[in-house]
């Protein structure tokens, strides 16, 4: 039997977990041992009576910075228990989180996740430990806990056995490089608007074509960055196929 997906969370606020992940699909999966969760209280690794984990920023500036020595002790503790897990740090200075990276993580054994606070973490931690900095968007949160919950939710729902239908996640936004097509359900008529006729036609080919067209339209209008990337990938595919055909001849 495969080991459950393991999440080890380094945080100043262990009581924030599992939070919303204790409910719905993720909550049932946690109860059924499809994934496991542990929290590591960073303050437990401070060595003064006040459990201080931060200090003023070198060079001046507002706020406080999380200390590398204390974070490293907490991280080393978690890595000893989970030597095979990748280490991620939630920070607005990180690499953008993508659906492809989420899928990679969901197919692995789990992750150790460091939740940043204050003005951030001492940069020397990243220089001395193998840590992947991750950002969930171009905005600032009060701390990395909400970002960690978001990352975990995105991963957990892709673990086999969590979502009811095997193909449930395959047509969602970002899985194909596009935003997902619009969704409708009963009633057929609502406030003068009808469900598009094509979706009620029963013609699966027409429905598929309509959904593709709508996904492309919405991506082009709402996410021009994704649209340009999608067009680039689509344009390169015929070239790749032609090269493969020539090599096989």
UniProtKB/Swiss-Prot annotation:
Xref: CDD domains: TrmD-like
Cross-referenced InterPro entries: Alpha/beta_knot_MTases, tRNA_m1G_MeTrfase_C_sf, tRNA_m1G_MeTrfase_TrmD, tRNA_m1G_MTases_N, tRNA_MeTrfase_TRMD/TRM10
Enzyme Commission code(s) on record: 2.1.1.228
Matches recorded under Pfam families: tRNA_m1G_MT (PF01746)
Key words, A-Z: Cytoplasm, Methyltransferase, S-adenosyl-L-methionine, Transferase, tRNA processing
Enzyme class per UniProt: transferase
Subcellular location: Cytoplasm
Catalytic activity of the protein: guanosine(37) in tRNA + S-adenosyl-L-methionine = N(1)-methylguanosine(37) in tRNA + S-adenosyl-L-homocysteine + H(+)
GO molecular function, one term: tRNA (guanine(37)-N1)-methyltransferase activity
Record note on quaternary structure: Homodimer.
Function text: Specifically methylates guanosine-37 in various tRNAs.
Family indicated by similarity: Belongs to the RNA methyltransferase TrmD family.
Protein name as annotated: tRNA (guanine-N(1)-)-methyltransferase
């Amino acid at each position: 039997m495969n080991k459950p997906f393991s999440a080890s969370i380094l945080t100043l606020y262990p009581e924030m977990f599992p939070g919303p992940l204790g409910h719905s699909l993720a909550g049932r999966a946690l109860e059924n041992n499809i994934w496991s969760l542990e929290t590591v209280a960073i303050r437990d690794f401070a060595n003064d009576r006040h459990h201080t984990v931060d200090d003023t920023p070198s060079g001046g500036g507002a706020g406080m910075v999380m200390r590398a020595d204390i974070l490293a002790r907490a991280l080393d503790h978690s890595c000893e228990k989970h030597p095979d897990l990748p280490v991620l740090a939630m920070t607005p200075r990180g690499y953008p989180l993508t659906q492809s990276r989420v899928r990679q993580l969901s197919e692995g054994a789990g992750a150790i996740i460091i939740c940043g606070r204050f003005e951030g973490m001492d940069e020397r931690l990243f220089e001395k430990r193998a840590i992947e900095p991750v950002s969930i968007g171009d905005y600032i949160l009060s701390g990395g806990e909400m970002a960690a919950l978001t990352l975990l939710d995105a991963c957990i729902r892709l673990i086999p056995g969590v979502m009811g239908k095997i193909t449930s996640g395959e047509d969602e936004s970002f899985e194909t490089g596009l935003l997902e097509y619009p969704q409708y359900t009963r009633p057929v008529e609502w406030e003068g608007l009808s469900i598009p006729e094509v979706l009620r036609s029963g013609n699966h080919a027409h429905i598929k074509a309509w959904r593709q067209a709508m996904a492309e339209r919405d991506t082009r209008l709402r996410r021009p960055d994704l649209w340009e990337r999608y067009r680039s990938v689509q344009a390169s595919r015929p070239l790749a196929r032609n090269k493969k055909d020539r090599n096989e001849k």
